[in-house]
A protein has these predicted regions:
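Short phosphate-binding loop-to-helix
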Residues: 58-108, 115-117
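Short beta-strand/turn micro-motifs composed of small residues
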Residues: 9, 55, 110, 137-140
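Left-handed beta-helix
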Residues: 223-451
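Catalytic-core segments of class I nucleotidyltransferases/pyrophosphorylases
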Residues: 106-107, 114-115, 120-131, 144-287
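Hydrophobic residues within beta-strands of alpha/beta enzymes
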Residues: 51-53, 106, 136
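Eukaryotic complex-assembly/interaction regions
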Residues: 71, 75-83, 136-141, 221-223, ...
Length: 451
């Protein structure tokens, strides 16, 4: 059984101000390699022969340039064909629109995941599912204590027990606000009395699906409106169909797999997650890091750090647990700890940075002290500035561009809260039971806002 891959590259609104029209999310560097590189390498290790990279029309040119001049030029084997396709719209309609390009069963991937879970494990899980399983989704639990829990916001995932030989997805709901009620259908509980509601499972947005899913009929006949939705909503509707119809025993199902605790998995959907992904790569031995070739004129570069080509550091500068890009210039007595510094950054003398992310081409003048800050590309931090936990950004023409029509996939941060009401029209009120929200582990009362 062979597979094709579709990699979705959203705009990355949660990664502002690091992203820009010139530096889309998929090209943000992680350990001095574009984010997209890791998704492509995962596909390469899976032995896939065909990959379609989907992005917004505004990001098509820089991503195509990277594929042609960057990724392809580094590959000794040309066995995997990579094609870039622009699409502005929902991910459900995107998958349907790619029907002519999808010749095999397919794997849907985000561009922003970092994991040591072997791709063969994911493929084998799907291959071993019962025949009626039309697709398999991957979920994971956050294993990083340093992650900002407020940015995770998992949905309510209803499924058969994970301990079952073949766990099955039954439904997905946006996580409710505190004290809100969750409506659970009686028809589902009659058929699956051991159904479990999970509040800690996070969607990886990795799905393995049979090609026949592209012809799935939701009961509307022909081109159903249900395809004009985010992909997560399409998957949810297929899962619901498996139990809410009279002949549910014959319906297609969606399998589930939860990443084991011994494996790491992270998605770069926020600035804090992006910082952790860089640290995770430094710890993992499964990825080959580029060589450190900085000119260190008496500077101390820790073995737990990575420094790009052409970077120059003056005496008494210290770099620990940090990743520094190419062609940077660091003055005397600079101190970096736990930072990500992108290409072309200039640091004056005596600059101290702790747990910061510094964008491309930033200039930080003498004796500045930044702790936990994110600095937009090309920004100038004035001499002796002292900032803590701030976002430093300017107001450039790039920042004022309207990107509201860009392709936005739920692999980034899409909410389908409004669609639940539309999909419930055919369900009788007597088929619903209510679960009080106070019985659910809720972190805050603004959980429907995923922006």
């Amino acid at each position: 059984m062979e597979f094709q891959a579709i990699i979705l590259c959203g705009p990355g609104k949660g990664l502002e101000p690091l992203v820009s029209p010139l530096l889309p999310k998929a090209l943000l560097p992680i350990a001095n390699k574009p984010m997209l590189y890791y998704a492509l390498e995962w596909c390469q290790r899976a032995g896939l022969s065909s990959v379609v990279v989907v992005c917004s029309s505004s990001a098509e040119q820089p991503i195509s340039k990277y594929i042609t001049l960057g990724y392809n030029s580094m590959q000794t084997s040309k066995s995997m064909k990579v094609e870039v396709v622009a699409h502005d719209g929902e991910t459900g309609s995107l998958v349907k629109a790619l029907k002519d390009k999808i010749k095999l069963d397919f794997i849907l991937l985000p561009c922003d995941f970092i994991t040591d879970l072997p791709p063969q494990t994911v493929v084998d899980v799907h291959r071993n599912q019962p025949l009626k399983t039309i697709g398999t989704g991957i979920w994971y639990k956050n294993s990083l204590d340093t992650m900002d829990k407020q940015t995770l916001k998992p949905d309510l995932t209803i499924h058969t027990p994970i301990s079952n030989p073949y766990p099955q997805l039954l439904d997905i709901y946006p996580r409710p606000k505190a004290n809100d009620q969750v409506h659970v259908r009686m028809s589902m509980l009659w058929e699956y009395p051991q159904a479990t509601i999970s509040t800690s499972l996070l969607e990886s947005f990795i799905y393995v699906f049979s090609r026949k899913a592209l012809d799935y009929d939701f009961g509307g006949g022909g081109e159903s409106l249900k395809w004009k939705k985010p992909w997560t909503s399409v998957v949810r509707d297929i899962a619901r169909d498996s139990w809410r119809h009279a002949k549910s025993a014959d319906r297609d199902t969606v399998g589930m797999y939860v990443v084991p605790q011994e494996h790491s998995f992270i998605r770069c959907k926020s600035v804090s997650a992006y910082l952790e992904a860089n640290r995770l790569i430094l710890k993992q031995s499964s990825y080959t890091l580029p060589p450190t070739t900085a000119t260190a004129n008496g500077a101390a570069i820790g073995r737990d750090s990575l420094v790009g080509i052409g970077t120059v550091m003056e005496e008494k500068t210290s770099v620990k647990r940090s990743i520094v890009g190419a062609d940077c210039i660091f003055g005397r007595e600079c101190r970096l700890s736990g930072c990500v510094v992108m290409d072309g950054v200039v640091l004056g003398d005596g600059v101290h940075l702790d747990n910061c992310i510094i964008g491309n081409g930033v200039i930080i003048e003498d004796k500045a002290r930044l702790v936990g800050c994110t600095v937009e590309g090309r920004y100038v931090v004035r001499e002796a500035t002292q900032s803590k936990n701030e976002i430093l950004r300017g107001y450039s023409a790039e920042g004022l561009l309207d990107t509201s029509d860009e392709y936005e996939d739920e692999a980034d941060e899409e909410s389908d809260e409004d669609e639940d009401e539309d999909d419930d029209d055919e369900v009788d009120d007597n088929d619903l039971v209510e679960s009080e929200g106070e019985g659910i582990d809720v972190d805050d009362d603004d959980l429907f806002d995923r922006s």
